[in-house]
């Protein structure tokens, strides 16, 4: 799917991970043969694109399904490989899982209390009231991970360590950061067709033209060949980092809408659904993860 017509272009060799929420991404004005070219959106083109996908979604399924795009087998298998590694249940008895939980604890406390390290001791901190400050629904965060699994914990850690400014803005207030993040992790995995766990989202994602196109576009972005600037050890690691970047943009979109709203927890699910619909339309218009960030956050 082509992006909307450009007004200006920015060349990205990598994502500047400190610029989320408050600052514009760093730009590189020299041309790099392996850089991602990011076009700043034409507002009218973006508006028209949204309208066209909204109209397509109202055409009956028995007509539109003939026009649905599909993800080729090689790319889907690459997504399955990613899912097999990271989309697994969180287990309290697994040392590596508990260690990751500890990383989230330490990152949060380092940001909020400005200390180099707040050591995580599983016996003391695996169940602790401080988890509720991060937006978990109970003092035992493992209960929240039943739906999103280990991936949802990994993505919360990614946000806290790569976008500390975003974390400090979202955590500790009236925004249920952890609960929202876990929901977004579940949504992305379900959108990609990789959700093997039974949860309420499975019944809420009927195929629409926008949703199917977003799935194919996201799957393509995640499995495109790595750039020279992406020095992760494997294609799975590259795909995971890209998925984490999309996750962070989803969270920023949701937080932005929450800030505009009356902040009524009773309408939070409605806000979630509206954010998902907007994000999926933008995914349809974005040829890369970097372009998705620009479309979503520079409007």
Residue spans for each PLM region:
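Extended acidic/polar regulatory tracts at the flanks of large eukaryotic scaffold/adaptor proteins
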Residues: 2-299
